[in-house]
């Protein structure tokens, strides 16, 4: 899920905080970000490198609007500089044998067909993959909206 931080497929559900980076990244990373009134941070990694950036003021004053993107920009420029001469295959993880990948709808988590426009490859321990008949959010929606 940490790659969803910059994945535009999740815009319908929740605007990914680093979606502006998706066109700038040439490698795959897991990324987490955080924000308060007084600071902002990004931490991301792949199998070769970990990069964390925090910005804020020692006197706890608030960041202004333009400063909130600083940590994100410093993070992506730094980690991409380290990885610039490596291929994606060299920097991402091999999938363990007990893990399987399933394309799912990024909102519902239900499996989708190859023709679906919005799909996200998610990984599961073999035997725990979602099935087309899994209700996922249906029960919650039915209870909340009386369907």
Spans of features found by a protein language model:
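A penicillin-recognizing enzyme superfamily signal
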Residues: 1-139, 143
């Amino acid at each position: 899920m940490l790659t969803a931080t910059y994945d535009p497929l999740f815009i319908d559900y929740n605007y990914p905080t680093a979606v502006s980076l998706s066109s700038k990244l040439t490698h795959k990373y897991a990324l987490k970000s955080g924000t308060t009134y007084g600071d902002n941070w990004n931490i991301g990694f792949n199998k070769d490198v970990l990069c964390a950036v925090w910005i804020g003021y020692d006197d706890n004053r608030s960041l202004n609007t333009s400063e909130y993107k600083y940590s994100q920009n410093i993070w992506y420029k730094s980690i991409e500089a380290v990885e610039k001469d490596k291929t994606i295959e060299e920097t991402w993880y091999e999938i363990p044998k007990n893990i399987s990948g399933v394309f799912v709808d990024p909102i519902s988590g239900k499996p989708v067909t190859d023709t679906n426009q919005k799909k996200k490859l998610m990984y599961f321990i073999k035997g725990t993959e979602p099935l087309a008949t899994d209700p996922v959010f249906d029960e919650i929606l039915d209870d909340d909206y009386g369907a």
